[in-house]
């Protein structure tokens, strides 16, 4: 989470979603995130990781990899694990992805097709 060229955005979420974020953050503090991590920083991390993951999925799809099959398997795993376990597993994977992504130098390319890889809800 770079501090240069930052932009402020405002989002409104329900109190229930905020509490869910707090709960997920508390589960990760001290193990995968510093104890001082705020909900706002956590949201920034989630968004950054979503974009990085989306870009990687798009690149895999463009190279001919069967992304749809992998997504279906991940959905099955998430459903079987339950909501809390699925959330923690999802966040664990995002953190791994971000660590790999942020350790590589950026090539300056921007992928505007992120919405195409996330058309399913």
UniProtKB/Swiss-Prot annotation:
Region (Disordered): 100-121
Domain of life: Bacteria
NCBIfam families assigned: MPN121
The protein's name in its UniProt record: Uncharacterized protein MG202 homolog
Species in which this protein is naturally found: Mycoplasma pneumoniae (strain ATCC 29342 / M129 / Subtype 1)
């Amino acid at each position: 989470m770079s501090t240069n060229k930052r932009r402020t955005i405002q989002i409104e979420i329900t109190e229930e979603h905020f509490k869910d974020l707090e709960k997920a953050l508390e589960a990760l503090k001290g193990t995968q995130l510093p104890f001082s991590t705020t909900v706002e920083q956590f949201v920034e991390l989630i968004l950054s990781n979503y974009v990085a993951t989306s870009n990687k999925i798009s690149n895999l799809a463009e190279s001919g990899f069967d992304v749809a099959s992998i997504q279906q398997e991940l959905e099955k795993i998430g459903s079987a694990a339950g909501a809390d376990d699925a959330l923690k597993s999802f966040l664990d994977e995002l953190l791994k992805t971000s660590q790999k992504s942020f350790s590589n130098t950026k090539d300056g390319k921007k992928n505007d097709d992120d919405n195409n890889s996330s058309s399913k809800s």
